[in-house]
């Protein structure tokens, strides 16, 4: 199966081509450019370098969230357009799981900076989620992590390293970028989704919605994602 996998959920852009589990081509760049401008040219370049045609693709696997609102919208819209135009499978995987491309003992905690000392976070062990991905205050993440004997923090860790070291002097802290190759591997055996119903997993309301809700308290909050 020929797979196109990509992630634009953060400042990094990662794109990979796989044939079943074999990596054919991959590129990850962190140049601060608009993903909406860079994504399709990067895909076109990799497909051409691999000697493939767009019609050769059989499955699209995309990081569905959480992450940058704009980045997720770009990725999901592109994935849906390609899947629909080529009439092929579409699969979404966790952006946080895409940061866990390493083999370590214990629990891996991928984080993405959500500003104001908040993060998008997951807890993974042996490649599997043991706690659902969520948006949380980083102080709560540190408290929850105390139940695990050995932890490794990965992802956008730079702004949180001091807090981690204070709470977990023995913890491993690794800055890591999303891996489109891992995204492709994760999506290889997952069932395809309904293209029309496919949406980003934001895990947090956008700021404009937060501000609107402050002046519309009559809205039933059960219909919205929990605010941190």
Name each model feature, range by range:
Residues 1-64:
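N-terminal beta-alpha supersecondary unit
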Residues 11-29, 162, 172-178, 192, ...:
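Patatin-like phospholipase
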Residues 13-18, 119-123, 201:
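Short beta-strand scaffold segments in enzyme catalytic cores
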Residues 30-41, 69-73, 77, 174-178, ...:
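Residues at secondary-structure transition points
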Residues 59-90:
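DPxDG-like acidic metal-binding loop motif
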Residues 174-228:
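Acyltransferase
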